[in-house]
């Protein structure tokens, strides 16, 4: 649930009392009782010095002379970009502010029980310079570390083989063995957007994402606009990327100084925080992170008296996001490429391609037997190929060892077959989360309500009232996912319950059915109004004194536009189901549902106008609605809807970065901005949007980060564990996958887009546990590493999946034929593939730019024979309420030399779809080449 940082003009505010609370909260929610700001420290008194080396051609490094930490790190190709927060150097010059070049340690001498922490950032003193000439800067860090530290630390900046090198030499200076249970290298880059306007942030700031892959790990630092060179941080020698520890902002309440291992830079919606590259982490795994399954097993190293070890990182740049992997290869780093990614349904073959200068010695699965592995040999002499199959549900990892001893780890998530996972989710929604109490004073029944998986109970009260109030992303999430599930994978009992929810709750309570605010959508059905309830009605264990505990007036407000797409999506889903099946939808005709979706969309513009200037979460549903209005011949309504959307798109066209929201920076509006700027032909703005998405939606060998659009504050608004934290596969994953895959269908030679988009489209399935509970998101911090117990705002994530899931066939010159979302067979130059995504109603053949979709019916498999210019569709047998298939054929691109395929002339057309009678067994249909 995002909230806008800037004050809203009074005339446009949602509701007076709420707007005041809203503005106050965003400015101070993360800082209530915040300590004073630290004044600048003396670390800059001696000025700065540049590292000068002719062989360092890609980066310009400037160091603070007294600390030899980074003052600025800029790519030579675009020197106006600083990867580090050099613009804040003065304000971050006091003790406890971290800078690139610092070091964190957790140590324990032999015979001692407790670990002790040390940091070069906590109390700064000028380091003892050992070398400060041209291309090499070395310093003894003893002056900036406590006197009782049992090791000496020497830091060196240098250039090695054209790469910038940062190394730390650690020597045990005592007569006892020293256990190093925590060794963290702080990664401080310019992701601090505090106080910046949106355009300024896009011009100056960067995001960074980790591949926590042991010796093969790396960090990529990407400019917010997605353009320009990408900074890559990789291990030097044996400096494995074992864990990723957040640097929090806990401070001394009196002085404002950061506590040990903390940085006082305020974390919030405009600053996610910095992180430590953890080389060793056993000291944390035994204490702060005890009992948590990490990305990799925690380790320590024991340094004997007089013994020394060296750890380090190297820095170089890739010319662009899409060239990250080729740049890693050029710098002799291991590269992994997974198809369809790193989320493996148990009925789907996965493929892993490895590329490195050294041969693979072994590939093993942890836990043993979690993934079966078949060695397929080499592709194009470059990639070592493997076929994978998930055997056990849950988290797993592959550990690859190369002939030189390099170890690479890849995190996988094994899930049930997609169709089963989604069916389990639906069953859980309409049984465990089904709330049916006719005496509920808030008119929330019958319906699907939020759920707490930790207690095993429905969330009928929460002081963030929207969670229990069926509105906002965190309250509508469950019923929204349960609704859109039905148009792709309907269940008769669930559809009946959904219709009862629409008639009994949505229309007339959550949404006004008459009066001045007809079609307006309330902010919450649940509210905190103790004078209107029996004594002790509200749970006394909850804090009802926050702004989040809206009274009935605030909860009834209809001015938040972001609540409207949820309702539109529910109506539209029932329209699609009623239109394309027989007897499943019984309460209203399809025309009623389509009109409800249309009127609700217009009401968003008239009753909640302010935030419609921004892209809406799930806004893609408006584009689908427009297409359906046209298909049904409702030209007047279609013209009106298009006019309203053009007004919004014209505004976005005029803005440099049209991604405003309720927050100063967000990753949710881009989905709809891309849709409409593409639809109206504003390609330059669509490209700006796409590049911005690629900046925060990485392709990384990890089920958690691959295609996981950056989100880090919504646990505050929708989670049970409320904290600022990088959320993995929150709803940004599913929603941002929509433009990524749409763009891929327009440019089917760009495999990077498919990999990024498909990682995002499969992400929402990982949130579904074995019994069907769907969590808001995964907690990435190493003290938790688990899905949140609340369903929260999962719904928009599943909307992204439902509107976007498909099976993709493509061909790569090096990797050969690839299938995302199905199993592929190749024989005599022809290929066939099964469709194994849950809906099985969309197929894309990339070599042809051919997009095949079914409004009714399901694909079971597709045969494609390039030599004989043939496509054969295998359609699943008749199902409950579905006796005909309704096929749409679209060429979204024209790849060089591609044939165009069309339907036989004899096929009947209805509302733009080809109608094919289904048989009791499989139906086969052939497309014709021309």
Predicted ranges, named:
Residues 33, 322-345, 350, 643-647, ...:
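Terminal, non-catalytic domain-edge segments
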Residues 174-184, 323-325, 362-365, 884-888:
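Short, hydrophobic/aromatic beta-strand segments
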Residues 358-424:
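Extended acidic/polar, glycine-enriched regions
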Residues 32-267, 272, 291, 301, ...:
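Beta-strand-rich N-terminal accessory domains
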Residues 193-197, 326-347, 408-450:
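Low-complexity, Pro/Ser/Thr- and charge-rich linker/hinge segments at domain boundaries
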Residues 155-157, 168-172, 306-319, 402, ...:
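Short, hydrophobic/aromatic-enriched beta-strand segments in well-ordered soluble domains
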Residues 423-734, 739:
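Catalytic cores of extracellular degradative/oxidative enzymes
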Residues 15-28:
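Bacterial N-terminal signal peptides
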